[in-house]
């Protein structure tokens, strides 16, 4: 068995879709030299950002779905946009017919999930410092709350956005603090405060 992943399929040239149509319809593809590849034991995944944005009356890009929208409403809007793209924009409804109902609309990261992702990333940093540098790090409630507020401020960038928050407000300032204070191992450190408004962000530790 094998898995094929085609990322952001809407960016492919329309002629490429003819190849996919052959695969989805016949389960095989033959090249110009008569070589045939069979896909009977292959899972094919297409990813797409279709439906996230739409064109406004003035032609500018507008958000079609938002992170505060209920999942059911968001799913309906995305599916409608995908259908319109294949039927109206491309004029290729047969491709959509081959895909059928096998469309999974991923939800935005909701606040309760974002908190879990944040905790997982922070815990990993603490474990790595302990195991690799023998540096024991903990965060005060206030410091952790600062991270949480930053992570929840804008969830439109998903897990990557949360990772950027952790990097900008914890990893980088912590690395600077350890270097400036010549802490290279066998130490215990408590982060009392994250000064998020400083440029760059700084830590107060004890």
Predicted regions and their residues:
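AAA+ P-loop NTPase nucleotide-binding core of proteostasis motors
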Residues: 1-206
């Amino acid at each position: 068995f094998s898995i094929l992943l085609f990322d952001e399929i809407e960016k492919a040239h329309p002629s490429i879709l003819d190849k996919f149509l052959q695969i989805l319809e016949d389960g095989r593809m033959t090249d110009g030299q008569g070589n045939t590849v069979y896909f009977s034991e292959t899972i094919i995944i297409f990813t797409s950002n279709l439906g996230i944005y739409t064109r406004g009356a003035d032609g500018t890009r507008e958000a079609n779905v938002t992170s505060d929208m209920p999942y059911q409403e968001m799913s309906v809007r995305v599916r409608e946009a995908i259908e319109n793209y294949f039927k109206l924009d491309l004029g290729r409804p047969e491709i959509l017919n081959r895909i059928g109902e096998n469309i999974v609309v991923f939800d935005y990261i909701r606040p309760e999930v974002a908190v879990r992702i944040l905790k997982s990333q922070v815990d990993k940093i603490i474990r790595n410092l302990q195991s690799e540098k023998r540096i024991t790090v903990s965060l005060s409630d206030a410091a952790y709350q600062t991270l949480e507020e930053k992570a929840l401020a804008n969830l439109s960038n998903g897990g990557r956005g949360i990772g950027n928050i952790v990097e900008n407000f914890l990893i980088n300032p912590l690395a600077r603090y350890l270097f400036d204070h010549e802490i290279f191992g066998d130490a215990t450190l408590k982060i009392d405060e994250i000064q998020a408004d400083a440029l760059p962000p700084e830590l107060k530790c004890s």
